[in-house]
Every structure is written in C-alpha cells, then in structure tokens.
Amino acid sequence: TFLMRKLSKKILSLYAKKAIIGLASVAMVATMSLSTINVSPVKGATTSSTLVWSDEFNGNSIDASKWGFEIGTGSNGWGNNEQQYYTNRTDNAYVADGALHIRAKKEAYGGKNYTSARLNTNGKFTFTYGYVEARLALPSSQGIWPAFWMLGANIGSVGWPSCGEIDIMEAINAENKTYGTCHWNANGHAEYGKPTGNFDITQYHTYGLQWDNQYIRFFVDGNKFYEMSIANNAGDTDEFHKPFYLLLNVAVGGNWPGFSIDDSAFPQE
C-alpha cells in the first residue's frame, strides 16, 4: 500500500501579498508518519501577510468545505494514460492522527488494477499570486507518480493547456529527485521546468512555490532551484496571471513514469 502521508499541521502554506494560506504537511509513502509543521514566516511572506486559508487535518475526516475528489479514470487516463482508478473511499484517502493520507493500492476496481485518490480545491478555494508550500515525504518505487500541483481555475472553459499548470512537485519511479514545471499554451503546448539535484525524497522536505506578476519560483527546503519569468506575459504566459486551484494526488503508471510497475511495492492488505 502506498501512502501519500499525512498532511499534518500546516502541510501547505500560501503567502499572498497581504495574505497567507496555510495547509499542512504531506507525505506520500509506503508507511505513515509525519511531524507537525507550524506556520512561520517563510519566503514570500511579509510582516503584513495574513493567513487566508489553511487545513490542519485535525478532525476525523477530510474537510469537504476545502477539498473535493476527482473520481474515475479521466479522459485517456487523465490525459497521461495513468493506470489507476481514483476514488473518494477512505481506503484511498483519509484523515488520521492529524494528517491526510493518500494511499495507492493494488486492486481490481472500475476496470483498472490500481486505486488511488486525487484531491483538489476547485470551486472551494482559488488564488492568484502568493507563496504556497507543503512538507512532503514521497514514495519511491517503479511506476509511482506523486504530485503537488496547481491548475488554472478556468480549465472548464478554455481547456488544457490554455488554463495553465504549475507542478510544484512531481516525482516518478525510484528517482532521488523531484521536478518543478510550468505548462501553458503558446501556439501549442509549451512547458518549461527543471529537476532538483539528488536527495532522499522518502524523507520529509518542504516544497514551496513563490508566485508573483514577475516570476514563478520553485523551492525545496527554502532553496530555490528554478524560476521562470512571466513578466509582461513573456512567452505568451498570460495564463499565469489568473486564479489557480491546488491538487494533491498519487498516480500509478502513465506516459511519464512508464508502464512497468513494481507490484511488489504494494503490500497485500
């Protein structure tokens, strides 16, 4: 069983110009444990910042006023030929011990051989510009694809990639690195991103995004590893000056990680 470990206290913090959004810590791993994370001034925050959104995951269930589920297999495996069926079952996503757990399982369900969960704040919370971060411990196994990311809130009317996509953190297979990437429409699909250096992704690290009208900057543990200019809509990047919402998921297989999946990494339950 793969677990996107607990989004525990302050898994995510979004610091806007005069606003701060806080979430908790996230972990995506085969076993569960997560340290508490407290909100404190971080990159992008100022003394005039105000917390505008947070989730402490200190209840008994996922807060439906903050999070929604995407169910099923999506169009063409969510556009990526992913191999899992996303559910809203507590088998795949639940709150326990002050944390959110997202778990990918090896099981036949809905015509697929794997299940998992994909949560988002679409229709519940969106923002334009700010600082957002999550503390994550990730799974590392062939065929696993955890992600902490954002999509433009206008995706329903303009589609992808015209809505824009910001991947704050993605990891695939057993690589000891993560990726930060932007996707948008510039007379066709455009993307620009960069991997981090090697480190142990199975341990907790803080993944952050600083977003303003000039740059999108990506951080791991407070260290910037990549930035992209969006000033004056450089490179047809007008998508990145509009509201976005947050997503968290663990995919299994797909075009990027490939279709060789290590089933031995999914313990029988």
For every predicted segment, state its role.
Residues 1-22:
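Bacterial Sec-dependent N-terminal signal peptides
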Residues 9-14, 40, 65, 97:
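Polar/charged alpha-helical tracts
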Residues 29-48:
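Sec-dependent signal peptide cleavage junction
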Residues 45-269:
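GH16 jelly-roll
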